[in-house]
Each structure stands twice: as structure tokens, then as C-alpha cells.
């Protein structure tokens, strides 16, 4: 299975990079992982809604360039569906069983995802109603993907 994580912005903090590297290493046993970072646009202070939408559109266009036609796209969105870790593992397994061997997870920037990206998504997923820094969220997503594969393989880890 091929899994891409397409996210806005670069990871700067060493502790987050270390966690991403660790989960990437762990996931190499289960899938081919590709982490893609697209540039984030600077948001001016007191930006209008129109300015924010333009920024999301620019970031969205960069994201869409990295999504393959055959990808099952899962957008991480506050308005998405909240599911358990078991349901998440079922979602990944159902992709595989229905011939979707390529999953693209999309993490937006500080303003979220553009309408174009959300409309391309096959599934909208929310981890919580709370807001998280998108850099930290990448680690959380990798951990849940790793947990999902451990669940699917019946291996100890999930508790």
C-alpha cells in the first residue's frame, strides 16, 4: 500500500522531526510512505475573509498538484467525521480491499483546506473538535496510521 501525507508547511522543531522519523521507520514494514510538504502562504495580520480564501486557494493548488488521479483522498478537517482507531483501521483496510492501494492524507495550513481540496476528498476525517498545530498533527496522524496497521495485523500495540 502507498500512503502519502501531503501537508502545508515545513517541520522546524527537532522533536517533531524525530517523532516523524520514528513513525516513518515503523511504518516502512507496512506501507510505502511519502511525506510531501508544500509551501505555506504568509497570512497578514487582520486578513479579510477574502484574503484568507485566496491564501487557502494558493495552498490548495499546491496540494492538488501532488494528488494522483487514483488516490483515495482523506482530508483532515474539523468538520469531518470523528471515528475510533478501530474504525480508522477499517477505513484503511476497505481502501485496500476495494483496489485503492494509494491513500493521500491531506493536512491544511493554519487556515485549513480550500474548497477545491475538500471537494476532491473521498473522505473527510476529524480527530477532534479541538484545533491542533498542523506540525504536531502530522505526528498524530502518523501514530494513528501506525496503530491502524498494528490493529489490522493483529499485532500488540493497540490498547
Swiss-Prot record:
Job of this protein: Specifically methylates the pseudouridine at position 1915 (m3Psi1915) in 23S rRNA.
Chain residues that bind S-adenosyl-L-methionine: 76, 108, 127-132
Keywords: Cytoplasm, Methyltransferase, rRNA processing, S-adenosyl-L-methionine, Transferase
Organism expressing this protein natively: Clostridium botulinum (strain Kyoto / Type A2)
Entry annotated with the keyword Plastid: no
A molecular function (GO) term: rRNA (pseudouridine-N3-)-methyltransferase activity
This protein's GO CC annotations: cytoplasm
Family: Belongs to the RNA methyltransferase RlmH family.
NCBIfam families assigned to the protein according to its UniProt record, in alphabetical order: PRK00103.1-3, tRNA_RlmH_YbeA
Main location: cytoplasm
Protein location: Cytoplasm
Catalytic activity: pseudouridine(1915) in 23S rRNA + S-adenosyl-L-methionine = N(3)-methylpseudouridine(1915) in 23S rRNA + S-adenosyl-L-homocysteine + H(+)
Protein name per Swiss-Prot or TrEMBL: Ribosomal RNA large subunit methyltransferase H
Amino acid at each position: 500500500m502507498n500512503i502519502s501525507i501531503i501537508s502545508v508547511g515545513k517541520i522546524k522543531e527537532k522533536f517533531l522531526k524525530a517523532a516523524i522519523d520514528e513513525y516513518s521507520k515503523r511504518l516502512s514494514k507496512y506501507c510505502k510512505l511519502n511525506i510531501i510538504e508544500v509551501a505555506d502562504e504568509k497570512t497578514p495580520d487582520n486578513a479579510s475573509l477574502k484574503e484568507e480564501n485566496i491564501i487557502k486557494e494558493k495552498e490548495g493548488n499546491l496540494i492538488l498538484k501532488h494528488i494522483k488521479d487514483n488516490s483515495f483522498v482523506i482530508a483532515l478537517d474539523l468538520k469531518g467525521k470523528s471515528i475510533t482507531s478501530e474504525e480508522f483501521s477499517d477505513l484503511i483496510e476497505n481502501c485496500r480491499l476495494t483496489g485503492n492501494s494509494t491513500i493521500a492524507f491531506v493536512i491544511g495550513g493554519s487556515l485549513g483546506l480550500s474548497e477545491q481540496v475538500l471537494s476532491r476528498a473521498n473522505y473527510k476525517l476529524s480527530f477532534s473538535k479541538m484545533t491542533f498545530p498542523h506540525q504536531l498533527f502530522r505526528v498524530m496522524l502518523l501514530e494513528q496510521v501506525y496503530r491502524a496497521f498494528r490493529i489490522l495485523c493483529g499485532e500488540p500495540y493497540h490498547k
